[in-house]
Amino acid sequence: MIEIRFEEREKIGLQYILESLHGCSPFGQERIRRLRYYTPDQRQELELELYNVERAAAHAEELKDLYDQICVVLCQMKDIRGSLRRCRELEVPDHVELFELKGYLQRLETLRPMFERLRDAAGLTGLEFHDPAPALAILDPENTRSRGFYIPDAATPKLREIRAAKKQVEEQLYRAQTDAEKDNLRQKRVRICAEEDSEEMKVRRAMGAALAPLADDLMADADTAGRLDFLIQKALFAHRYGGVRPEITDTALELTDMINPELCDL
């Protein structure tokens, strides 16, 4: 694996460039922070990345509004990879994890058609997102498309029954007159809430298990979001400074009309 020390990155101006790139998503920020270097046997992969940056930079002016829209969605994404790993390992996700997973899927649902417009207009290749609809159907079975996460009463017949009983007790508690009656109803409500928590945990376990087969695709989509984020940042940087796609050859390195972005910005 190729490594370049921080001091070397600073000396050649690479660190200044990296600090000029503003990744929007946690996935893009990680790619910038953990910059990878291509080895000779990864030349084809590098050529593909350079091609995509060239195409995206060439359309930076024309697609400026679309880039801005994509970046807004990327900024709204949270790093849900830990929760996806837990689902893949059949651990029970909690409410917060399911809320964040649902939010991620909704952002993915919004991002996908935007990306397809960019891909088709700029001619990008080698980047694809999976359809988030099957995963969203698990976390939003009633198709409400609300931003929050809530386990619906209809999740199981028992949950519906428990919540109906809880509502009835709460109404009785509201109308109760004596302290003894209120204490009795409060104790009853505590028992019902414990049953509700137990039943909800079963539902969360089932949701996590249903997401498990989809986890790898969703993890791949997080990686693609990071690639897209980094790609856009590099394309905008290239457009700003008039960068061109380098031609990789087996001969000596030849640079023509080079500029130093750090000196340009002084």
Regions picked out by a protein language model, each given a short descriptive name:
Residues L50, E54-A57, E61, R81-L84, ...:
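A structural signal for well-ordered alpha-helices, especially hydrophobic packing surfaces
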Residues D131-D223, R227:
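Extended, charged alpha-helical coiled-coil/arm scaffolds that mediate oligomerization and mechanical coupling
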Residues E91-V92, D217-L218, N260:
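Short, solvent-exposed coil/turn linker segments
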Residues Q15, Q29, Q42-Q44, Q76, ...:
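Residue-identity detector for glutamine
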Residues M114-F129, K202-A209, F237-G243:
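Long amphipathic alpha-helical segments
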Residues M1-I151, A155:
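Conserved amphipathic alpha-helical "coupling/scaffold" segments
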Residues L105-R112, H130-I138, L159-R163, A238-L253, ...:
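Hydrophobic transmembrane alpha-helix bundles
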Residues A220-L266:
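Conserved NTPase motor "head" modules and their coupling/switch loops across ABC/AAA+ ATPases, GTPases
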